[in-house]
Regions:
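Active-site and NAD+-binding cores of ADP-ribose-processing enzymes
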Residues: 1-78, 100-215
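Conserved structured core elements
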Residues: 88-92, 165
């Protein structure tokens, strides 16, 4: 998936990755308000438009969550048509992560989690946080510390094309297949705030109606 420090073969790389993942923190979703942004598609049947073709409102609550499979392109943690829900800890981060072209409309909704969904935590971000995390989780292995920082970089990189997401999707597939978690917690390159990607039971998460924003 990515080169190890000693250039071992892919199987050894996978073993190193799994060793690191097994020592990463599992966390439940903090019970606070989280935000979801969806770029509004042209001629979307779920949107009301004015006579000039501009949307009059955002998506209603039942459409503010994970998008229909037909609208989903490959992303950081999902293949094309795969319904992974991306949300952020504040409105600004949600909008930036949606990466809407200038002049496009975005619908921003919020939700409050009250469940025991478990995520793998890649969010320690500052030098002090990373040092504390490494000393606690990886005190027996400098290699695992190195692997964690590489995984975190892959999940945070501000990639834009579907093709460039191959590495992060391969990593997330490894997590899905080998770790008993429902998603990941990671850092936004744009704001340094937390994002979540949730692949289990994401259609049952309730959102507010979306507010209309212009990118």
């Amino acid at each position: 998936m990515f080169e190890s420090k000693n250039q071992d073969n892919k199987q050894d790389n996978l073993s190193c990755i799994l060793s690191c993942l097994n020592q990463c923190d599992r966390v439940t979703i903090p019970e606070k308000k989280w935000y979801r942004a969806r770029v509004i598609n042209e001629d979307d049947a779920d949107i009301v438009y004015d006579g000039m073709g501009n949307p009059l409102r955002g998506y209603l609550s039942d459409k503010s969550g994970v998008a229909p499979a037909k609208y989903i392109s490959s992303g950081r943690a999902n293949d094309r048509y795969e319904q992974v829900l991306y949300i952020a800890e504040d409105e600004e981060t949600a909008q930036k992560e949606a990466r809407a072209d200038e002049g496009r409309y975005v619908s921003v909704a919020s939700c409050n989690f009250q469940n025991d969904m478990v995520l793998m935590d890649f969010s320690p971000y500052t030098e002090e946080q990373l040092s504390d995390y490494a000393n606690t989780n990886f005190s027996d292995s400098q290699l695992n510390t190195y692997m964690f920082t590489q995984i975190q970089k892959i999940l945070t990189m501000p990639e834009y094309s579907e093709k460039e997401y191959i590495i992060s999707r391969t990593l997330v597939k490894c997590i899905k297949e080998n770790m008993d978690v429902s998603g990941i917690l990671y850092i936004s390159h744009f704001t340094g705030k937390k994002n979540m990607a949730i692949w289990d039971d994401n259609k049952f998460i309730k959102f507010t109606d979306g507010c209309l924003k212009l990118a």
